[in-house]
């Protein structure tokens, strides 16, 4: 049975650590980086904040601090939670070959359900996501309650997808709840109108069922849906 290769994964976390810190309109408070959420950090043995965008010594010290944390990490969870939510799916794409099936399953579920918009991750295609979901063990991918609901899905059933303005109509997140789809169709619209898609799904094509955010979510590749229409 394949086990998780922590040594190889640590080297990838280190490479993520050295990504350039990109500024945003809210910098230094908010930055774009796989690990750092802010350019303002607290250093060990110090009680004042430092701006690592301007202070090279502070930047080097915080990098050394993280390098030591990565080196001392003794579990995949410790490494995984160093990565920001918006980068977790990308991280999994890079470490997938070093993960046990159990760890791939639990981490993919966490990354998917914690991401604000996993269907439009520019670094991970829907084809790659589908392949990763197919590799998982569904008993580890889902909670006991989710797995029970998944097992009891009918052979064919109706699903909906709320598509807000500017969002991907071919995403993998669908739901059995029309009310949930309505909510998503109006999310982030800012005055523009979204819409609801309806389709027929086959149980054999369902990649996962998640309800940890009360969204009654059916994860399925849109290519496997039938009778897609707009309500």
How would you label these PLM feature ranges?
Residues 1-157, 164-172, 178-231:
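Conserved NAD+-utilizing ADP-ribose enzyme module
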């Amino acid at each position: 049975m394949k086990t998780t290769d922590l040594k190889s994964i640590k080297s990838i976390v280190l490479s993520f650590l050295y990504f350039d810190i990109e500024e945003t309109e809210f910098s230094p408070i908010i930055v774009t980086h796989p690990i750092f959420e802010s350019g303002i950090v607290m250093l060990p043995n110090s009680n004042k904040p430092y701006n690592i965008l301007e202070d090279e010594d502070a930047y080097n010290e915080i990098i050394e601090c993280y390098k030591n944390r990565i080196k001392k990490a003794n579990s995949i969870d410790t490494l995984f939670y160093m990565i920001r939510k918006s980068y977790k799916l990308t991280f999994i794409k890079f470490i997938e070959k070093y993960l046990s099936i159990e760890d791939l399953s639990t981490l993919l579920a966490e990354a998917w359900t914690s991401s604000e918009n996993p269907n439009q991750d520019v670094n991970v295609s829907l084809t790659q996501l589908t392949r990763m979901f197919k590799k998982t063990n569904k008993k580890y991918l889902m909670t006991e309650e989710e797995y029970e609901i998944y097992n009891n899905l009918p052979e064919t059933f109706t699903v909906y997808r709320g598509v807000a303005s500017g969002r991907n109509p071919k995403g993998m997140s669908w739901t059995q709840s029309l009310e949930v789809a309505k909510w998503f169709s109006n999310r982030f619209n800012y005055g523009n109108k979204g819409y609801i898609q309806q389709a027929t799904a086959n149980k054999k094509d369902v990649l996962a069922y998640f309800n940890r955010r009360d969204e009654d979510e059916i994860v399925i590749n849109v290519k496997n849906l039938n009778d897609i229409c707009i309500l």
